[in-house]
């Protein structure tokens, strides 16, 4: 079953895959990494002007990584805002996804956190560097195949 946005994208020949609806009835779409930036711009122009959140997760050990975007279409005079969830999957061997920082500025810290925890590189992000872990940290802590070090260096804060 396709939602209204999926039908709208299909009429315009924009490649995507409908993943159905979540428990709140929000449509979920899968977009290929190479198509994500252009579709993000189209969605912004179409009215999805608010990025509610961006997160990422490891789908399975040795499998794909996913970057998830929750977008909201806010319009004056409309009581119920339209929402959509976009999932962009990438291979863990070279996890690269175009950054949408230049479309929605609120992805700045969120894409940095996804990079820091899962190692997804967001191409053309202006400040893509670790945000939670020290720069010297080796590995990506939220990957399912991550092996935690058996020691942690505690530094004196003074």
From Swiss-Prot:
InterPro entries: NADH_DH_suC (IPR010218), NADH_quin_OxRdtase_su_C/D-like (IPR037232), NADH_UbQ_OxRdtase_30kDa_su (IPR001268), NADH_UbQ_OxRdtase_CS (IPR020396). One of its GO terms (biological process) is cellular response to sulfate starvation. The lineage of its organism: Eukaryota, Viridiplantae, Streptophyta, Embryophyta, Tracheophyta. This is NAD(P)H-quinone oxidoreductase subunit J, chloroplastic. Its EC number is 7.1.1.-. SUPFAM superfamilies: Nqo5-like (SSF143243). NDH is composed of at least 16 different subunits, 5 of which are encoded in the nucleus. Keywords: Chloroplast, Membrane, NAD, NADP, Plastid, Plastoquinone, Quinone, Thylakoid, Translocase, Transport. It holds the Pfam family Complex1_30kDa. It catalyses: a plastoquinone + NADH + (n+1) H(+)(in) = a plastoquinol + NAD(+) + n H(+)(out); a plastoquinone + NADPH + (n+1) H(+)(in) = a plastoquinol + NADP(+) + n H(+)(out). It comes from Arabidopsis thaliana. It is a peripheral membrane protein. The keyword Electron transport does not apply. GO terms for molecular function: NADH dehydrogenase (ubiquinone) activity; quinone binding. PANTHER family: NADH DEHYDROGENASE [UBIQUINONE] IRON-SULFUR PROTEIN 3, MITOCHONDRIAL, NADH DEHYDROGENASE UBIQUINONE IRON-SULFUR PROTEIN 3. NCBIfam families: PRK12494.1. Gene3D superfamilies: NADH:ubiquinone oxidoreductase, 30kDa subunit. Belongs to the complex I 30 kDa subunit family. The keyword Lipoprotein does not apply. NDH shuttles electrons from NAD(P)H:plastoquinone, via FMN and iron-sulfur (Fe-S) centers, to quinones in the photosynthetic chain and possibly in a chloroplast respiratory chain. The immediate electron acceptor for the enzyme in this species is believed to be plastoquinone. Couples the redox reaction to proton translocation, and thus conserves the redox energy in a proton gradient.
